[in-house]
Amino acid sequence: MAQPLCEPRSESWILSPAGRQPPMPSDGNSVCSPAWSSDPWDGAQASSPAPPCARPARRAGTPGRRGTHGSRLGSGQRQSASEREKLRMRTLARALHELRRFLPPSVAPTGQNLTKIETLRLAIRYIGHLSAVLGLSEDNLRRQRHAVSPRGCPLCPDSDLAQSQSLGPRLSPAVCSGVSWGSPPAYPRPRVAAESWDPSFLYAETASQERQEMEPSPSSPLFSSDMLALLETWTPPQEWPPA
């Protein structure tokens, strides 16, 4: 019986996984090889690519979840900022509406619509008019401060000027009454005024005053009639022990 050219292949490699290769014949010169197989199922297995790994897909999905979370935070911050801006605008509109109530119809007519800038300008103009009517301008207030505090306030910017103005009238008579250094006085001065500045005269006057205070007069309460009677009846103590 003739021996076949190719050894019979086992069918176990057909049911093996896609990554496992069929067993190669031991004879290298054999013309039978898996590449020569005409089985279409075997060719489909060799040409089909390996299935992609699932792990990279999960990694790719992670940045998407982070991006979604960050977008939610950004939208929340934008919404809170818009809410704060709306609240600020409502507060400003309410304050300007309250200011509009204090403006008289002659300044702001009742049916006239005013913008925020126009309302502020009219209010400033009306306040300036009231200050002029009541005498509360800066010049009047400065005069009142000088009249109340002639010495000047240390916190006021014009305190030095006010102090110099207040001290000027006080010093002017003394300056006018004085004479130049080289010329003699126009009228003779009294001698008492000259003696009052003499040191010897001052010392003598002070000594006389002290002497008068040390010598009480009989009319003083220390030397009343009862005190004089006691002094007359008083006798000096005798020596002890007696001789």
UniProtKB/Swiss-Prot annotation:
Chain segments carrying region Disordered: 1-86, 204-228
Motif (CPLCP) on chain: 153-157
GO cellular component: nucleoplasm; nucleus
Gene3D superfamilies per UniProt: Helix-loop-helix DNA-binding domain
Function: Transcription factor. Plays a role in the epithelialization of somitic mesoderm and in the development of cardiac mesoderm. Defines the rostrocaudal patterning of the somites by participating in distinct Notch pathways.
Disruption phenotype: Mice embryos exhibit defects in single heart tube formation, due to a delay in mesodermal migration. However, the cells eventually acquired migratory activity and gave rise to an abnormal heart tube. Mice lacking Mesp1 and Mesp2 die around 9.5 dpc. The major defect is the apparent lack of any mesodermal layer between endoderm and ectoderm and a defect in the migratory activity of mesodermal cells. It seems that a compensatory mechanism exists in which Mesp1 expression is up-regulated in the absence of Mesp2. Mesp1 may be involved in the rescue of somitogenesis in the null Mesp2 embryos.
Protein name: Mesoderm posterior protein 1
Keyword Transmembrane helix: no
Keywords: Developmental protein, DNA-binding, Notch signaling pathway, Nucleus, Repeat, Transcription, Transcription regulation
Organism: Mus musculus
Pfam families: HLH
Main location: nucleus
Molecular function GO labels: cis-regulatory region sequence-specific DNA binding; DNA-binding transcription activator activity, RNA polymerase II-specific; DNA-binding transcription factor activity; protein dimerization activity; RNA polymerase II cis-regulatory region sequence-specific DNA binding
Regions annotated as coiled coil: none
Domain of life: Eukaryota
Compositionally biased residues, Polar residues: 27-36
SUPFAM superfamilies listed in its UniProt record: HLH, helix-loop-helix DNA-binding domain
Tissue-specificity statement: No expression was detected in adult tissues except the testis. Expression in the testis was regulated developmentally; expressed 2 weeks after birth, and increases, reaching the full expression level in mature testes.
